[in-house]
Amino acid sequence: MSDSFKLTVELLDFWHCGTGKGSGEFLDAVVERDRVGLPYVPGKMLKGLLRDAVGLCEAWGHVDRGLQRVLFGSDAFDERTGQPAQPASPGALLVSNACLPTVLTAWLAHPGNASYRLALFRDVFSTAVDVESGVAEGKSLRGMEVTVPMTLEAEIKPMPGQTPPAGWQSQLALALPLVGAVGQQRSRGLGRCILQPVREP
């Protein structure tokens, strides 16, 4: 078996992985793009979601005890005390960004295909409604740029100098169904997804 673990992230709905910045007065949040203007899920975010999923599998007894810490490291802060964790560890795995397939990325990056790149994005708006009157509250309109559904690819491999425990790929695969959404506003319906391992031929 290869030392790496490849997976697909199938986005089922609009999703938003943002920069925390807006675009002036029109949009309050814009999508983070790579160097050619394409959307992606940052590896750091994906790693955090996988870490939580493995933690659940560990708590339920489906994977080896201590696997979450070995693969993904310890928290920077102790959740119980709020103090820095002692000692903090980075974990054994490196998680790449989840991006569009290489061939599609190369095609979309062509200068003549700018209109297709723009077609990957939409603008959505929301507002707060007064529960008594049923009327929109003043100055509550918010605009967000989102990305259309698509399938992304990511790769997970050992960090240089680290040796994960034998069988880590199969144990990690057990946790993938527990990641149900990615990006911002996951609890409000954005970013529903299915994570699946890429089977080697």
Q: Where are the predicted features?
A:
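Intrinsically disordered, low-complexity linker/loop segments enriched in Gly/Pro
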Residues: V129, G134-V135
